[in-house]
């Protein structure tokens, strides 16, 4: 298989996953079928079935893509801060996470898709496992960052839980509540640093 064919295959798979996320975010998880994704992605039904044998495979793939895209955007923003200033503050880090969640909310479907997948994970062991692994990575990464910045008394689990509330407020269009959660995170970090 040539490099061009591999690239084309990857793009087709990415297109299918993007379409699955749009369907989940706009119509709900139970409207996700191979046919609905094929129609949204403008590919043959057999193409969707080729990449994802079952709806569970498609669901887990969509979640993993959502997480990978989030991490890529956050990493790029943090790298940009490091290139400009040599480092970044906790406030800037919190701002990057908050802006990522806000941009998902503005997309019109990504934050809703993440919420739908979270709810559905209670019925799907593989999706629940993927979510647990993503959560562990997040907690470990945030904890290392907090420790490195001198916030050894701050528990990353608490910070991420507040961001879970922030995301929930965004899903329910409670923008004022979401902004208060960001302030709550920053205040909590400062109090616990002492």
Regions found by a protein language model. Give the residues of each.
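Short, basic, alpha-helical segments at the C-terminal edge of helix-turn-helix-like DNA-binding modules
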Residues: 64-71
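Amphipathic alpha-helical packing segments from all-alpha helical-bundle domains
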Residues: 71-72, 105-115, 119-149
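Hydrophobic/aromatic-rich alpha-helical bundle segments in the mid-to-C-terminal region
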Residues: 5, 127-132, 147-194
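Hydrophobic alpha-helical connector segments
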Residues: 75-107, 159
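Short alpha-helical scaffolding segments that buttress acidic/His motifs in well-ordered protein cores
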Residues: 97-101, 114, 118, 159-166
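Helix-turn-helix
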Residues: 15, 19-61
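An amphipathic alpha-helix signature
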Residues: 60, 94, 136-143, 186
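N-terminal intrinsically disordered/low-complexity leader segments
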Residues: 1-11
């Amino acid at each position: 298989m040539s490099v061009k064919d591999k690239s084309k295959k990857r793009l087709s798979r990415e297109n299918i996953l993007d379409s699955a996320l749009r369907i989940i975010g706009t119509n709900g998880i139970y409207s996700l079928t191979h046919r609905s994704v094929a129609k949204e992605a403008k590919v043959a039904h057999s193409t969707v079935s080729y990449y994802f044998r079952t709806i569970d495979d498609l669901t887990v793939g969509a979640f993993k893509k959502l997480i990978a895209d989030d991490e890529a955007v956050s990493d790029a923003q943090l790298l940009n801060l490091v290139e400009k200033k040599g480092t970044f503050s906790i406030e800037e880090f919190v701002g990057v996470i908050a802006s990522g969640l806000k941009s998902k909310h503005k997309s019109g479907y990504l934050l809703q898709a993440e919420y739908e997948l979270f709810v559905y994970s209670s019925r799907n062991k593989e999706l629940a496992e993927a979510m647990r692994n993503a959560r562990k990575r997040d907690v470990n990464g945030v904890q290392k960052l907090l420790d490195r910045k001198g916030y050894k008394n701050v528990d990353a689990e608490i910070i991420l839980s507040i961001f879970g509330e922030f995301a929930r407020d965004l899903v329910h269009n409670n923008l004022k509540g979401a902004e208060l959660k960001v302030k709550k995170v920053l205040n909590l970090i400062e109090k616990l640093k002492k």
